[in-house]
Design a protein with these regions (language model features):
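Conserved positions in beta-strands of structured domains
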Residues: 14, 106-109
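Mixed-charge, low-complexity intrinsically disordered regions
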Residues: 1-101, 113-122, 126-227
Length: 227
């Protein structure tokens, strides 16, 4: 009889995005977006990350902790298809899946040994909300994990050009200096749902403790306030 192990949270990621709105749709889309992986006390032994600093990228296995539902549906409506077409849940990366697990490839910028927190992984390009629980971490292996000729299914040909972001430099001063490029990258990626195109609508994005308000007209996003 198979033994099914209950997964334990080994770490949580800290990012500037406390809400779902604004989180990049996939890892790597906003390489400027920084985060820190902080281990739970039980897993803060520096020996557990020995040698990890030699890898440029890592895999994070995590849970869509705010999307866990009872039961599941065999089909979902991918946002990339405008929410109008159903696909099999296992042919998508929808959070609404049986175990609500996510998989992200992120850049490992450095490993810090913090006196209080133990080993802290500084990463960039993550697509996770602040506080997301992480179940496992594995090194990215270029010789086996990279598939340049892979077919991307319904996502092939769906790439969208980034928006042009207009923002008064004085507004950006409200954001910590080392987080500004991440914010601009998130905005350029167009955080709006695909079906919302009203140029008069004002959107609010929670980022680094601030509410960033903006409008979008065509391919131009204008930041109107940072509160």
């Amino acid at each position: 009889e198979e033994a099914v192990t209950e997964m334990k949270i080994i770490a949580r990621i800290r990012t500037e995005l406390p809400e779902k709105f604004g989180v990049p749709r996939q890892s790597g889309l906003v390489p400027q977006l920084r985060g820190r992986v902080i281990f739970e006390p039980e897993y803060r032994n520096p020996d557990a990350v020995r040698g990890l600093e030699d890898f440029s990228h890592i895999w994070l296995i995590w849970q869509f902790s705010r999307a866990v539902r009872e039961g599941w549906s065999p089909t979902v409506r991918p946002p990339r298809l405008g929410g109008n077409r159903r696909m099999g849940v296992f042919a998508t990366r929808s959070p609404f899946r049986p175990n609500a697990l996510g998989l992200s490839s992120v850049r490992l910028d450095r490993v810090e040994l913090d006196p209080a927190l133990g080993p802290v992984l500084h990463v960039s390009g993550a697509d996770l909300m602040d506080g997301t629980p992480i179940f496992d971490i594995k090194p990215y292996l270029p010789y086996t994990d990279s598939h340049p000729q892979a077919a991307g299914g319904f996502t092939d040909g769906l790439a969208h050009a980034p928006l042009t972001v207009a923002c008064d430099p004085a507004l950006l001063e409200h954001i910590p200096a080392d987080s500004r490029e991440g914010l601009l990258g998130v905005l350029a990626g167009d955080p709006r749902p695909r079906y919302q195109e009203d140029p008069q609508r004002v959107y609010g994005l929670s980022f680094a403790g601030h509410n960033v308000k903006f409008t979008v007209d065509g391919d131009r996003l204008t930041v109107i306030a940072v509160e």
